[in-house]
Amino acid sequence: MNYFRRVAVVALLTLPCAAQAQSGGSTEAPGTTPSVTVSGSAAIASDYRFRGVSQTDQELAVQGGITVGHDSGLYVGLWGSNLAGWGTFGGANMELDLIGGYKAQLSDSATLDVGLTWYLYPGGADETDFAEPYVKLTGTTGPATLTAGAAYAPKQQAIGKWYDDGAAAAAGLYDHPGAKDDNLYLWGDAAVALAGTPVTAKAHIGHSWGQDGLGPNATAVAPTGGYWDWSLGADATWRNLTFNVSYIDTDISSREAGYLRPSFSKGQDGTGNIAGGTVLASLTAAF
């Protein structure tokens, strides 16, 4: 993946230049809306949960992202977070997501979003990075915003079943070296703004389908092969700051995930359920 990482770095370095060139005052008439917009965020969270599973070993997460959008609907973005424990793909202590897509306004209240997320793990092993196309349909009605989405990662080595269980991974003995597998994730989100308050109630549910073993780096996108994740929470916004508190859980029990240990555990020492229910708090600053 070294070649692809170099391509990603070059693309990211050109984003600010492209944005500056396209949004300069010389190309926009006074009073008109810029054709290119740049937005970003920085956040601190008590844990980084990806589809209900901790990627920071149930410890603090520091995250940030930037998006460059064009009024045609095209956009590119970059998002990153620290990692620990199970989340460290091939020894990487950082996740870097390169995102590109297109948003189409279907009506005043409906938007279709089609794109691709490229999950990068700088400093990790060779077989870590993988690509995942997605599609999202979002609609609004009154104070409610509803989203339905699907993300499908085609067969790739980084998400293949190289180990049948955690014991094989701990011993470093591949059961299926070079294996490629795919992964499907379907989800739904709901957000309801509470009238007269800065609070928005939020709910999420998703289901993952993938291989039931461990990949080349003793991790997996869909631990146990298939599971549900869900969350209930609320946002409170003040100016450009958003405080969120959510309860997050999955239906992966400690007993069910036992065969994936020690990889699938806190500290990767065989103890603790990193997919169990937890209260997560985060503070995000938008700019």
Protein language model annotation of sequence segments:
Residues 19-40, 49-55:
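Outer-membrane beta-barrel biogenesis signature
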Residues 42-46, 64-70, 98-102, 116, ...:
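Residues on the lipid-exposed face of transmembrane beta-strands in outer-membrane beta-barrel proteins
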Residues 72-78, 108-114, 143-148, 196-201, ...:
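Repeated loop/turn-to-beta-strand initiation elements of outer-membrane beta-barrel proteins
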